[in-house]
Amino acid sequence: MVIKAQSPAGFAEEYIIESIWNNRFPPGTILPAERELSELIGVTRTTLREVLQRLARDGWLTIQHGKPTKVNNFWETSGLNILETLARLDHDSVPQLIDNLLAVRTNIATIFVRTAIRNHPEKAQEILAQAQTVDDNAESFTALDYGIFRGLAFASGNPIYGLILNGLKGLYTRVGRYYFSNPEARKLALTFYSRLSTLCDEKAYDQVLDCLRAYGKESGAIWHSMQGTMPSDLAEARR
């Protein structure tokens, strides 16, 4: 395995995660004893202990006092925070993972965007107005797009939607930087934000669903046209 982490803790974390992913430490099995594992990885037991606690919080492991550390089935025990890790571990699956990410965003947005526009129209308009001053580059549009969806999620009155968007931020941002490098993607997004603003003004709440689905379909078509030239390091973390 190729591990790029620079710190001992980062190295140990990547080593264990990749070992779980590659079934060196299969789900359901017991992790090697602390002394053995620290020697195997080449880190101190103190560093290893900190890493194991962090991996347990992320759902990779189960640690119980007086019992061996168990490897979890991370699909069942982890949260959205491991999306970037999964994308980095399996480059071949990145397009499908991103398709799933975008589908989730569209599906939940049909609920929270409509609710935000209906129940808190002034706040929704304030959020959408950010699109009027955005710089025409990928970085700015990525921040804008995430900010609008996240802002409307919280404006819906149900903070759980906002927390879901928080969990998607890492991979969402990496994808956005590439997707919004396409001028057509930026143009489509501005049209979408403007349309939402109009629907908010007109109190046309029943049209929000169709607007979101149309945007999901059109932005998905642009995204699929870009997959052939997608950089191999799209999911790599900045270390």
From Swiss-Prot:
Keyword Transmembrane: no
Key words of the record: Activator, Cytoplasm, DNA-binding, Fatty acid metabolism, Lipid metabolism, Repressor, Transcription, Transcription regulation
Primary localisation category: cytoplasm
An example molecular function term from Gene Ontology annotations: DNA-binding transcription factor activity
DNA-binding region per Swiss-Prot/TrEMBL record: 34-53
Stretches assigned to the HTH gntR-type domain: 6-74
Main function: Multifunctional regulator of fatty acid metabolism.
Matching PANTHER family: FATTY ACID METABOLISM REGULATOR PROTEIN, TRANSCRIPTIONAL REGULATOR, GNTR FAMILY
Quaternary structure annotation from Swiss-Prot or TrEMBL: Homodimer.
Protein name: Fatty acid metabolism regulator protein
Organism: Yersinia enterocolitica serotype O:8 / biotype 1B (strain NCTC 13174 / 8081)
